[in-house]
Swiss-Prot record:
Name under which the protein is recorded: Large ribosomal subunit protein uL14
Similarity comment text for this entry: Belongs to the universal ribosomal protein uL14 family.
Molecular function GO labels: large ribosomal subunit rRNA binding; structural constituent of ribosome
Biological process terms in GO annotation: translation
Keywords from the named record: Ribonucleoprotein, Ribosomal protein, RNA-binding, rRNA-binding
Subunit text: Part of the 50S ribosomal subunit. Forms a cluster with proteins L3 and L19. In the 70S ribosome, L14 and L19 interact and together make contacts with the 16S rRNA in bridges B5 and B8.
Native source species: Alteromonas mediterranea (strain DSM 17117 / CIP 110805 / LMG 28347 / Deep ecotype)
Pfam families membership: Ribosomal_L14
Length: 122
């Protein structure tokens, strides 16, 4: 459950370390984003010589949330923190590696590149 002003960890090697959500995309009054939703973020902390730098405004897809995701069988998958993967203008990941697990729900949102790069799909 991500909303405006939420700080997220970055789960790829794009060069960003922490980002802040500045808008939830998908409707003029949409308040919350969950796993698989695209948000607009600004880079708050970045590493030197990375692909993105502090202050950049990018799209990102949410891959892990503390709120978790509810499955059809009644189970819930929760994570210890909120994390996102940076996207370019074509909705493709900027980084070439994904860190940490991601959920199967990204498959239904057609983020197959993220699924294939992830070390573990829950």
């Amino acid at each position: 459950m991500i909303q405006m002003q939420t700080n997220l960890d970055v789960a790829d090697n794009s060069g960003a370390r922490r980002v802040q959500c500045i808008k939830v995309l998908g409707g003029s009054h949409r308040r919350y984003a969950g796993i698989g939703d695209i948000i607009k973020v600004t880079v708050k902390e970045a590493i030197p010589r990375g692909k993105v730098k502090k202050g950049d405004v990018l799209n990102a897809v949410v891959v892990r949330t503390r709120k978790g995701v509810r499955r059809a069988d009644g189970s819930t998958i929760r994570f210890d923190g909120n994390a996102a993967v940076m996207l370019n203008a074509n909705k493709q990941p900027i980084g070439t590696r994904i860190f940490g697990p991601v959920t199967r729900e990204l498959r239904s949102e057609n983020f197959m590149k993220i699924i294939s790069l992830a070390p573990e799909v829950l």
